[in-house]
């Protein structure tokens, strides 16, 4: 176990006597999904299949939702949705806890996410993100951010929903960080609504501390820990939209964060 993982998490993981059994049960199912459903999903995402159906019921989008939900179940996660995602072009803004966040939202509605470029190299998640039209950016690059902002506006104007994590990085699930306001300008430029989305992984309305990344923890150690975790809920709350206020993107960011904090029951 990575020594950088929270000190309250590592002892609990070591003392979990059922963890080997969960690995034994879930790993074959995970491999099966990669071997069978992966190629099926790839077939569904080709240009011809993408034209089957219309709106949110295209074969492509249904396959993304199914594949994402199946992947979460491989990790023992029970999806619990509250509220409804807005239809059409929307800027979804969510708190960021885990690499699972993109998969969880995709299980409800496929969207083009803005995500760090490293995710493209991650197994399962990277493939899903790339096929679903994720907009990758290089952290710390002003040029990359400008391109990302322009791409987001173009996608929104074309009717494609976009998802962002305005905190700028994942947290530990015990609080919601400050939302950076700049990304909210894309909703103003494209004249689309902003819908806050609250995410949580745990039981009885409490965030499980073993799901978020530990300090300096890499993807694979976290992936393995989550794979062996006891079953828990994966909550996705679609909240009341935030009114688009010209020249007030900071207020839009604050209101979005406030609604997520209130929904999750965190102190500000």
Model-derived features: where do they sit?
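Membrane-embedded segments
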Residues: 97-156, 160
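A conditional alpha-helix N-cap/helix-loop micro-motif detector
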Residues: 61, 95, 118, 142-145, ...
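A transmembrane-helix-recognition feature enriched in membrane-embedded lipid enzymes
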Residues: 12-80, 127-131
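A cross-family acyltransferase "interaction/gating" segment
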Residues: 124-127, 174-255
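Generic beta-sheet signal
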Residues: 89-94, 116, 137, 160-165, 197-199
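Catalytic-site beta-strand/loop segments enriched in glycine and acidic/polar residues
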Residues: 155-184
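Soluble, non-transmembrane catalytic domains of enzymes that act on hydrophobic metabolites at membranes
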Residues: 1-14, 67-82, 100-102, 178-182, ...
């Amino acid at each position: 176990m990575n020594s950088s993982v929270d000190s309250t998490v590592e002892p609990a993981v070591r003392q979990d006597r059922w963890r080997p059994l969960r690995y034994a049960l879930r790993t074959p199912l995970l491999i099966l999904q990669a071997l069978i459903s992966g190629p099926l999903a790839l077939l569904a995402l080709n240009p011809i299949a993408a034209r089957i159906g219309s709106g949110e019921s295209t074969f492509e989008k249904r396959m993304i939702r199914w594949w994402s939900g199946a992947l979460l179940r491989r990790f023992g996660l029970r999806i619990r949705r509250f509220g409804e995602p807005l239809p059409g072009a929307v800027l979804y803004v969510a708190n960021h806890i885990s690499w699972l966040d993109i998969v969880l939202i995709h299980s409800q509605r496929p969207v083009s996410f803005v995500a760090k470029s490293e995710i493209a190299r991650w197994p399962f998640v990277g493939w899903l993100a790339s096929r679903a039209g994720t907009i990758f950016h290089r952290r710390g690059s002003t040029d990359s951010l400008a391109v990302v902002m322009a791409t987001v506006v173009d996608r929104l104007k074309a009717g494609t929903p976009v998802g962002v994590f305005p905190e700028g990085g994942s947290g530990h699930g015990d609080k919601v960080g400050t939302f950076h306001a700049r990304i909210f300008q894309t909703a103003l430029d494209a004249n689309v609504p902003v819908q806050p989305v609250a995410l949580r992984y745990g039981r009885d309305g409490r965030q499980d501390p073993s799901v978020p990344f530990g300090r300096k923890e890499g993807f694979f150690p976290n992936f393995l820990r989550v794979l062996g975790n006891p079953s828990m809920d994966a909550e996705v709350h679609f909240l009341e939209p935030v009114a688009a206020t010209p020249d007030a993107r900071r207020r839009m960011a604050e209101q979005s964060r406030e609604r997520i904090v209130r929904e999750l029951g965190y102190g500000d």
